[in-house]
Amino acid sequence: MAVLVKWPWLGVAIPCFLISFTGYFAHFFVLTNFLSFKELLWFQVSLSMIWISYWKAIYKNPGRPTKGFRPLRYEWQNYCTKCETYKPERTHHCKRCNQCVLVMDHHCPWTMNCVGYKNFPHFIRFLFWIIATTGILLHYFVKRIKFTWVNRYATANLVSKQELIFLTILTPLDAFILLTISLLFVRCVKNQIVNGRTQIEAWEMDRIENLFYHQRLLPQLLTNLKEIYPGSLEGQEKEVEEFLSSSTCSFDEVINFPYDINPWVNLLNCMGSPLNWLNPFGGPKADGMVFQKNEISDYDEATSIQDKLLALPWPPDDTRHGIAFPSVSHVEKDTQGGEQVVRRRHVPIAVPPRNEWYNDWGESLEHFGVDVEVE
């Protein structure tokens, strides 16, 4: 679940304290007792890369739309009243940064900045170097603990009490940092590289799936299809009626996330050239306002209704609440003139609107920093 910090400065102060305490106390009170100068140097290089990546993740602007931007013809025409400009695809207005953010992933309390198109590589490198450094450090700690245990009965004082104290404190702390950051890193990699989605887009997919299974999505998609592609359903009234009444349609047959090409292309889109992946100042070279889409999103007038729905821009419901159609039967019984009368009424299932919907992690749009008032 997304974390909200009461005092924003704490979001930066806590990581700075943990990096300094774990890294430098380990260096001076544990590692210097048994590592070579070369090994200590490499550890400090890795620790320095954490600081550089963290600094870039904090101060690099995540990216904002250029003035005068206009969406393409078959994209949603979303206008931000606060920035007074049209929002490109995948863009959201951050309430805390007070700007529209290109490919907004989330507002990170630990950097006091949004994670977006321009600084996502710095954020990922920050996580990577934390994992690399704490992983190496945990290896050294375990090695030293093993040495201490094997020589616990030695007459010579091979390990000082001071070193034992810091080993006891730093080992579980280092393991905790490694575990939590690894989980966050895996989540980011799964979303952005495997599925080609930001965390907000992954949340959006869950919300749309919820609408689908509550039978509020398909009528809205058909309405949007006629809006984006006028005349797309002309003369197909019978097919539309059969499509709505059919219960065999699956979620994947009508919903396509257009920015998921393949893991390699997804990786290049969010991290840039492989030569820049570990470059502390590297990043993608595109403008972050127009993106390549997969073949499934190509519109063809001659295809079926399902295939046409797959060509809708993201999100396919245009963030609308969805149109309800009969989904739950409510049977009422009454007696009239000595005869029992049965009435079957259809009651639409209530679904919270987008700005009030929560996923299974307990996250709403506000948890990601999105300004729901201008969405």
Swiss-Prot record:
Tell me where in or outside the cell this protein is found: Endoplasmic reticulum membrane
Q: What is its main location?
A: endoplasmic reticulum
UniProt-listed InterPro entries: Palmitoyltrfase_DHHC (IPR001594), PFA4 (IPR033682), PFA4/ZDH16/20/ERF2-like (IPR039859)
Task: List residues in topological domain: Cytoplasmic.
Answer: 1-9, 55-121, 186-375
Q: Which residues lie on this side of the membrane: Lumenal?
A: 31-33, 143-164
* Keywords linked to the UniProt accession: Acyltransferase, Endoplasmic reticulum, Lipoprotein, Membrane, Palmitate, Transferase, Transmembrane, Transmembrane helix
Q: What class of enzyme is it?
A: transferase
GO molecular function term, any single one:
protein-cysteine S-palmitoyltransferase activity
* EC number(s) stated in the UniProt entry for this protein: 2.3.1.225
Catalytic activities = L-cysteinyl-[protein] + hexadecanoyl-CoA = S-hexadecanoyl-L-cysteinyl-[protein] + CoA
Give the UniProt entry's GO cellular component terms: endoplasmic reticulum; endoplasmic reticulum membrane; Golgi apparatus
TM ranges: 10-30, 34-54, 122-142, 165-185
Please name the catalytic residues of this protein.
C108
Keyword Transferase set for record? yes
Record's bilayer topology term: Multi-pass membrane protein
Q: Which GO BP terms, alphabetically? A: protein targeting to membrane
The residue ranges of the DHHC domain are 78-128
The family this protein is said to belong to: Belongs to the DHHC palmitoyltransferase family. PFA4 subfamily.
Describe the task this protein carries out: Mediates the reversible addition of palmitate to target proteins, thereby regulating their membrane association and biological function.
Note what the entry says on domains. Answer: The DHHC domain is required for palmitoyltransferase activity.
Name the UniProt record assigns to this protein: Palmitoyltransferase PFA4
Protein species of origin: Eremothecium gossypii (strain ATCC 10895 / CBS 109.51 / FGSC 9923 / NRRL Y-1056)
What taxonomic ancestry is recorded? Eukaryota, Fungi, Dikarya, Ascomycota, Saccharomycotina
